[in-house]
From Swiss-Prot:
Pfam families assigned to the protein according to its UniProt record, in alphabetical order: PseudoU_synth_1 (PF01416)
Gene Ontology MF annotations: RNA binding; tRNA pseudouridine(38-40) synthase activity
Keyword list, A-Z: Isomerase, tRNA processing
Entry EC number(s): 5.4.99.12
Record-annotated active site: D51 (nucleophile)
Chain's role: Formation of pseudouridine at positions 38, 39 and 40 in the anticodon stem and loop of transfer RNAs.
Organism lineage string: Bacteria, Pseudomonadati, Pseudomonadota, Betaproteobacteria, Burkholderiales
Reactions the enzyme catalyzes: uridine(38/39/40) in tRNA = pseudouridine(38/39/40) in tRNA
Gene transcribed to yield this protein: truA
The name this protein goes by in its record: tRNA pseudouridine synthase A
Family, per entry: Belongs to the tRNA pseudouridine synthase TruA family.
Quaternary structure and partners: Homodimer.
Residues bound to substrate: Y109
Entries under InterPro entries matching the protein: PsdUridine_synth_cat_dom_sf, PsdUridine_synth_TruA, PsdUridine_synth_TruA_a/b_dom, PsdUridine_synth_TruA_C, TruA/RsuA/RluB/E/F_N
Species in which this protein is naturally found: Burkholderia thailandensis (strain ATCC 700388 / DSM 13276 / CCUG 48851 / CIP 106301 / E264)
GO biological process terms on file: tRNA pseudouridine synthesis
Length: 270
């Protein structure tokens, strides 16, 4: 039997998603909890591995098991053994054709950026921060150069293991909201550090260091050295993983963050 789980977690509490010998990752915490509840080892496959500091609102995993438990039993039973910084939101039996990673056709990330002369301790692990105003119109113009199917080599980490740097970036939405600017990135898939590298470049344009057309030059160069430094992880949220309707994957619960209404308005999609 294949079971899918919807997971939320505070990325600041973990050293990324992928299991490590030190055991301080989200995958390690989840698999320990599953083992306690199921009384057997269960290996999880994830939709998208996130880095240290990156949060998960709509993460999806699957595992195979011979155990027959009610859906909500998996939720409550696993959560009983998880730390407060990670929680299973839903559980659902799936056909063998479902795969958390390979069945997904799109991913959506949001970035919450606090723009203020003084940093906020209350937002230290929840939002990125810049101390100077940003030109939103310039960033929007720059983002237009990135939308579409491109070779995103200039925005991939040197540690990226993706077979191809070609991805289809469907949308970049940018919306100011008081002292915040919110960003929405939706694509069929993302390279390692791709969203944070895009953020670094957009912020550089917003600060006036480069014109909006610079993003087209960086993209065309396919050279990571031509782009801005990787932006901080704290404001980044994996919010949604899209699957074919036949799997009826439950939607992510974005209401757990204070900016959910702003995010929903970026283009009218969850």
């Amino acid at each position: 039997m294949r079971i899918a789980l919807g997971i939320q977690y505070d990325g600041a509490a973990f050293c990324g998603w992928q299991s490590q010998p030190h055991g301080k990752t989200v995958q390690d915490a989840l698999e320990r909890a599953l083992a306690e509840f199921a009384q057997t080892s269960l290996h999880t496959t994830v939709a998208g591995r996130t880095d240290t500091g990156v949060h998960g609102l709509g993460q999806v995993v699957h595992f195979d098991t011979d155990l027959d438990r009610a859906d909500f039993s998996w939720v409550r039973g696993t959560n009983a053994f998880l730390p407060s910084t990670v929680a299973v939101q839903w559980a659902k039996p799936m056909p063998d054709t479902f795969h958390a990673r390979f069945a997904a056709f799109e991913r959506t990330y949001y970035y919450a950026l606090y723009v203020h002369p003084v940093r906020s301790p209350m937002l230290a692990a929840r939002a990125g921060w810049v101390h100077t105003p940003l030109d939103v119109d310039a960033m929007r113009e720059a983002a237009e150069h990135l939308v579409g199917e491109h070779d995103f080599s200039a925005f991939r980490s040197s540690e990226c293991q993706a077979k191809s740097p070609v991805k289809h970036l469907y949308q970049i939405g940018i919306r100011p909201d008081g002292d915040f600017i919110h960003f929405r990135f939706r694509a069929n898939a993302f390279l390692h550090h791709m969203v944070r590298n895009l953020m670094g470049c957009l912020v550089a344009v917003g600060r006036g260091r480069y014109p909006a057309s610079w993003l087209a030059e960086v993209l065309e160069s396919r050279d990571r050295g031509c782009a801005a430094p990787t932006f901080m992880p704290e404001g980044l949220y994996l919010a949604h993983v899209g699957y074919p309707a036949e799997f009826a994957v439950p939607p992510a619960q974005l209401g757990s963050v204070p900016w959910s209404s702003v995010w929903a308005d970026l283009d009218g999609r969850p």
